[in-house]
UniProtKB/Swiss-Prot annotation:
GO terms for molecular function: phosphoric diester hydrolase activity; protein-containing complex binding. It is found in: Cytoplasm; Secreted. The lineage of its organism: Eukaryota, Metazoa, Chordata, Craniata, Vertebrata. This is Tubby-related protein 2. Residues 285-294 have a biased composition (Polar residues). The gene is Tulp2.
Amino acid sequence: MDREGPRGPRSGASQENEQWKKETLEDEFSGVRLQKLEQQRQLFEKKQRRKRQEPLMVQANPDATLRHRRPRRGEERFQSDSSWGLGVGSPFLQENVPQAHLPSGAHSALVTMSYVADGSGERAPLLSPRGAVYTRGNGPAVRHHLCWLPDSSDSDVEEVTMEDIPVISRPPQTNLANLRRGWLASPGPGISQEEKEEEVGSTDARVEDKTPSPDPDPDPTVNSDGDHGDLAPCKVEENTAQKNTETASGIGDEDREKGEVTESTETNYAPVASKVLQGDDGDASNHNAWNMTCPQPRIPGPRLGEDMEAYVLLPAPRDHMVQCRIVRNKHGMDKGMFPSYYLYLEAEDGVAHFLLAGRKRKRSKTSNYLISLDPKDMSRNGSNFVGKVRSNVLGTKFTIFDNGVNPERSYWVPDSARIREELGVVCYETNVLGFRGPRKMTVILPGMDSRKQRMKVQPQNDQDSILSRVQKGAGHGLLLLQNKAPSWSDESGAYVLNFHGRVTRASVKNFQIVHPDEPDHLVLQFGRVAPNIFTMDFRYPLCPLQAFAICLSSFDGKLAFF
């Protein structure tokens, strides 16, 4: 009994020691397991980050906070309008207008997209769109969602908010070089803040139209200055003829380009065609500007099946002033930095015939405007490309070319290719007043021969160009034009020009081109009539392409004017 007494405590201590060792091993195993789990988690997160950085993957912005937007007002009203057939797919809008010519601003999307990643790097197919935000003018909008179908329940879900995504149906591919139809013009969207600043807000430097009161029985072929064949005084509707002076040039210029973005192959669309020349629903001035009627007869538009490339290069008739409209479209992915411009001819049948479309090239060292016969395809390599306007670094000198090839790049051009032809040069000069004074322009054109045909100028290098010839004093065979200097009016405190009722809004872009020896004989005049609508009237020896290119140069920003 005495020997067994001490064994009891020793056995209890050994059991406690074994239990302590067991707990220690379990703690070590659990620690190793946690370390392995942590390493696996880090590897998984690293793999997910690499997958998200791959191209064509929708990436989330961790700094952005998702906000729940309240539904806009008037959704029920928009749905009721759509039920009455007033939507984009209405047959009333598509009866005489091809779907390809619906404006890109007719649809605007505010879509919240979500996708599901499952570690495999693949995504499920996209659900059929349950809708988007369709707006008409300033009307209401309806918000819908798009999402990716999940592949598994263990996936990571991320949301991305994408704004200003145009919802545009793919237009049919048609070649418009052979057959052209007359598409009616419609002005662009409402006025923006930049355009409000561009229009004159003060009386320091603006140009007012000092159109005299028309005679009781004016001769439609004689203008207010007594010149035959010039612009005749236009008759405006009673609700717009409140006074005889109309603003024509003002402070400010086009908003400057803030940066060049990578050029994409997006499709441009002409404004919606309509049978009546009308303005924006929310701007009464647009409506008034489009309802002005002029007693002077207009020239007929292009015939169906006529070669449009030859038509836009043909000089205007000698005894007629060709009246046109330019519509600017500033909606799209570029957010107004690279708008599109559409030229329409106001024909004698009361219909505006589409002639040309132009846009500024994005990936270019200097300002470069491409001009095409197709409003849907304004690319350099398109079959309907007819010309371009290129500027120097300062944006003060613009050269107009046709669709020929550059002779300095003959190493990759076939021998059968036609060398490009220079159609003119536009030079802008700075003035002492800067923005507070009118622009000074000089237009240099190739001369006309005895058959009233334009002389060909096809320089092989820069030393043979029109601008170099003028700088060297060899101006033989060239025609020099300049803008008509406005006069200062003490009564209105502004520079004034007589635009004969064709210009109704103040803008620094408004100008008149005349011959130096005949200041009362207008060759080209350009001015604003609505926020995104401008008139362009020209005559011999200009052709539609030359006149349109000169006006495009007026839209471009001038670095030398800063």
